[in-house]
Regions:
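Non-catalytic, solvent-exposed segments at the cell envelope interface
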Residues: 2-451
């Protein structure tokens, strides 16, 4: 293994950012702001200091909305409520039908959609992603994640649903059939995707955040790039990834997008280009690593100019549901301002591969493992599916009844045993999600690092 990976691992053990200075003062100001906002909304309630609990230890983070929350949080601390309110008003909003109201103090779920829309891309970047300068190509949800936030427990959990997962469609069946991949639902906007997730899996959706190609690129550029340690030279001819040298290096612009999009990842080891055949599962892991690095980078930049640049670029490629209020973001920030990203739990829906007619290689929810994971994550808030996903026989049985376990850590990330990938796997094949309870990041994948 490359020395860079060893050094990065050693550095991750005990790292302090430049933001350590003044942290206590910032926290006091943040708590005071949160109390003021809460009192404004509920003047009859006494103002009490926010208590932050430690969460269970997790593995990786995969959520660009955390970066948005963090940036707004820093703006609040450094620039005041009115400035953050103005910046928040600049973020595009979309009406989402089917959302359930968020109840104060109760767990809630944020649907995170990574769209393959090329809107906002121009010139070389547009051509590299397959779009011309005058057209917008693609409108599918290549990233589908549900962020489960439990304010009382102080925990955050991320569930990823692979894009090839088969679901029962609620609309457009004449065009796509009764059953199809989950990512075809996004062409009509986030409402249909949110409703499909609830109908198929019983997961209630309270909020939505969408991120396009331009949104991810702009966020990385505004932060001055993120640092990732590549243990080997790497490339992906499909996404455009090109890392000629190993080691900890700054990734920004188009290469940042290329890392997050990489499904055909190759690494150069012992004179041979090796191929990661795990497809979407590999991409999920690399997205998690990239976004964890992005959040670490954002947390280290308590620079008003940098944060202002980041906030100014948020409207270019990021959209929130119209019901997501600034006060809710502030409450979220007050509760989780000391939350360590490494303590976030991440999971991938257990699936099994199959080939279905013209659809080719797809994935089906693996039962009872999938239902067990959903129950463990969402608990009593999980609803009974009205349109369950199909099994490999294209039948739609109700999910099995399973018991809630004492802790969600009993089921590890299902994208955790990818180190068995070989260069002989068919490029476009859907791959079964591993179920090894020991979550280990593949040795060839990039990880966050400190230069």
């Amino acid at each position: 293994m490359a020395d860079g990976r060893h050094n990065a691992s050693r550095g991750r053990g005990n790292r302090r950012s430049e933001a350590t200075k003044g942290t206590l003062a910032n926290e006091e100001r943040l708590r005071a702001l949160g109390q003021a906002v809460e009192h404004r909304a509920n003047p009859s309630r006494p103002v009490r200091a926010a208590k932050v609990r430690r969460s269970h230890r997790g593995r990786r983070i995969a959520i660009i909305s955390s970066v948005v929350v963090l940036a707004l949080l820093i703006a609040l601390v450094g620039g005041g409520y009115l400035y953050a309110q103005w910046r928040f008003s600049q973020i595009p909003k979309v009406n989402v039908v089917g959302e359930l109201p968020q109840l104060s103090g109760r767990p809630f779920n944020i649907l995170e959609i990574g769209s393959d829309s090329r809107a906002g891309l121009t010139g070389t970047v547009a051509r590299q992603t397959g779009a011309s300068t005058n057209s917008v190509a693609g409108q599918r949800s290549d990233v589908v994640k549900i962020m489960h936030v439990d304010p009382a427990a102080g925990t955050i959990t991320i569930l990823s649903i692979p894009r090839d997962t088969m679901v029962t469609l609620l609309a457009n069946q004449a065009l796509f059939g009764k059953f199809n991949r989950i990512n075809v639902n996004y062409g009509n906007g986030p409402s249909l995707l949110a409703q499909t997730i609830t109908a198929n899996f019983g997961i209630p959706i309270n909020h939505v955040i969408q991120v396009s190609f331009a949104g991810l690129i702009n966020a990385a550029v505004a932060l001055g790039g993120v640092y990732l340690d590549f243990p080997y030279p790497a490339k992906d001819a499909y996404s455009g990834l090109n890392i000629p040298h190993p080691g900890c290096q700054l990734i920004t612009g188009f290469q940042a997008l290329a890392v997050a999009r990489s499904r055909h990842y190759q690494w150069f080891q012992n004179g041979v280009w090796n191929y990661d055949g795990t497809s979407d599962f590999g991409r999920i892991d690399r997205q998690n690593a990239f976004l964890r690095a992005m959040i670490s980078r954002a947390k280290s930049l308590y620079n008003p100019l940098t944060i202002n640049s980041f906030l100014s670029k948020i409207p270019q490629g990021i959209t929130l549901d119209s019901g997501f209020s600034l006060n809710e973001l502030i409450a979220f920030a007050v509760k989780f301002h000391s939350f360590n990203p490494s303590n976030m739990l991440t999971y991938t829906l257990p699936t099994v591969p199959a080939t279905v007619g013209l659809l080719g290689d797809v994935l089906f929810a693996q039962q009872p493992e999938a239902q067990q994971l959903l129950v463990n994550i969402f608990g009593s808030s999980l609803l009974t599916p009205t349109n369950p996903p199909p099994n490999a026989q294209l039948q739609t049985p109700l999910p099995p009844v399973v018991a809630t376990t004492t802790t969600t850590t009993t089921i590890a990330s299902t994208s955790s045993t990818r180190a068995t990938a070989t260069k002989t796997t068919t490029a476009g094949a859907a791959t079964k999600s591993p179920s090894n309870p020991t979550a280990v990041m593949p040795y060839f994948d990039p990880v966050p690092c400190t230069p």
